[in-house]
A protein has these predicted regions:
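Dinucleotide-binding Rossmann-like beta1-alpha1 core, especially the glycine-rich loop
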Residues: 56-57, 64-117
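Residues forming the flavin
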Residues: 1-83, 124-129, 134-465
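Extended, charge- and Ser/Thr-rich helical segments
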Residues: 102-108, 118-121, 127-136
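Short catalytic-loop micro-motif centered on adjacent basic/acidic residues
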Residues: 114, 118, 204-207
Length: 465
């Protein structure tokens, strides 16, 4: 099969590549390959089964059209300071300009016009003052919250728009390899387990998301595509009562706090805050169970959850950060019999495990009821655990009650975007004809910045004709 552009991965980066080409009037043939299912066929059975059933061949939360982010929460960060290192490659001004442009596209397809995190100047100053006292930095970032259920409708509208405008989509097909001729990428080989296909194209865009970060890292090694080990984030999902987070939830919606706690001074940050939200489980390759969180526009819980992530940057000779994070996750899963572990913060400080009956005695009712009470410190590396404990205690200055005895910590929370593919400002890799976008490229983190990268890629291809 021949095409002008083949896009591997139907997450925000891949979607916005195709979307921008169409908006620029390009008539080039676009083929999109996605190993998951279309939006309308993505359903997590846990709502009925009340526990994860390890869907095969892939978890519907992490795989399919719109990627993992849209099914976890659907938050669009509207500041270039949030979402990865892409601004260092393309420049802050272009990054912010394209964020504003992509945001308008989301609005066109039905995103809520309300923006969280604006106004409340005096209360924002008070939160910042507390953060400074605690040795933390508060990052200003307005948020457009689509919500898990609303995001699905928005991406369904985008999916249909792309199909109506001639984009060919191959769902259930996985990319097995690149097609190379004389050190030039000519396309991809794909398979659905029964049928093998080869798609030849002038431009091959790989945008496989966090789910595909490990696969892309191996591909780079196999084909000698210039890349470098990047950062991997290891942490926990914290859950507290809404009353504890009331001021931050109302004023900021999402508190973006960054610190460098002693003694290691690694970067530790909050991420993906969900007021009235729900803790969730995602399954990656080899049934690796990872915790996440999401919130709906309408359905609300009594709790707020957010992740606390510790960034790891390894030095020579170690160059397998993704494998390292996976091992941490596997060990935690082993202790929890394949499930997510949950522990009270006070029990961690007391050096004891948490028992299921103790959870029932707390003010907090876990929103991930099948998480197994236990001891996350038995699997979490000392460095990461120390950083997390010290960061939570610093957070208590900003949000009194955050470090309460009954505060819940779920593990493991892992972010697989560590491989950094070396590219120029037009997203050309060292392999001619190949472009790598989104979280799997190591340059972005989250829906909006991946959308920005796709927009710029689509614009460039359309201009070339």
């Amino acid at each position: 099969m021949n095409a002008d552009v083949v896009i591997v991965g139907a997450g925000p980066a891949g979607i916005f590549t195709a979307l921008e080409m169409i908006k620029k009037g390009s008539r080039q043939k676009i083929v999109m390959v996605e190993k998951g299912q279309p939006v309308e066929k993505r359903h997590c059975p846990k709502d009925k089964t009340k526990k994860c059933v390890n869907c095969k061949p892939y978890c519907h939360i992490t795989t399919g059209f719109s990627g993992a982010g849209a099914f976890s929460d659907g938050k669009l960060s509207l500041s270039y300071e949030v979402g990865g290192d892409l601004p260092t490659l393309i420049g802050a001004d272009l990054a912010q300009e394209t964020i504003d442009y992509a945001d308008q596209i989301y609005l066109e397809f039905g995103a809520d016009e309300h923006i969280e995190g604006l106004g409340h100047e005096e209360e924002r100053k008070e939160i910042r003052r507390r953060a400074i006292q605690a040795g933390l930095k508060l990052v200003d970032c307005p948020i457009r919250h689509m919500g898990t259920e609303k995001a699905q409708g928005i991406y369904l509208a985008i999916e249909r728009y792309l199909q109506e405008n001639g984009v060919e989509m191959y769902f259930g097909y996985e990319c097995s390899n690149l097609i190379l001729e004389n050190e030039v990428c000519k396309g991809v080989a794909i398979s659905d387990g029964k049928t093998d296909l080869e798609i030849y194209a002038k431009h091959t865009v790989v945008a496989t998301g966090r789910r595909g970060a490990d696969w892309l890292e191996k591909l780079c090694a196999e084909h000698n595509i210039a890349h470098a080990p990047g950062t991997v984030d290891i942490g926990v999902r914290v859950e507290v009562r809404n009353e504890v987070m009331e001021m931050v939830n109302r004023v900021l919606y999402e508190s973006k706090l960054v610190g460098y706690p002693k003694p290691f001074k690694n970067k530790v940050r909050t991420f993906c805050q969900n007021p009235g939200g729900f803790v969730s489980q995602e399954n990656y390759d080899n049934n690796l169970a990872v915790v996440n969180g999401h919130s709906y526009k309408d359905l609300k819980s009594d709790n707020t959850n957010l992740s606390i992530l510790c960034s790891h940057n390894f030095s020579i000779p170690f160059n397998q950060p993704i494998a390292y994070a996976q091992k941490v996750g596997e060990l935690t899963n082993m202790l929890a019999n394949g499930q997510i572990l949950v522990q009270r913060f006070g029990d961690i400080l007391d050096g004891k495990r948490t028992w299921q009956k103790e959870l029932a005695q707390s003010n907090i009712r876990p929103t991930l009821p099948d998480a197994l009470a236990g001891d996350i410190t038995a699997a979490m590396p000392y460095r990461a655990m120390t950083n997390i404990i010290n960061f939570i205690q610093a957070m208590d200055y900003v949000v009194p009650g955050f470090a309460a005895y009954e505060t819940l910590l779920y593990s493991p929370e892992l972010k697989f975007y560590s491989n950094r593919v070396k590219m120029d400002t037009d997203f050309n890799t060292s392999l001619q004809g190949l472009h790598c976008l989104g979280d799997s490229s190591g340059w972005t983190r989250g829906l909006m910045m991946a959308s920005v990268m796709g927009t710029l890629m689509g614009r460039k291809i359309a201009e070339e004709g």
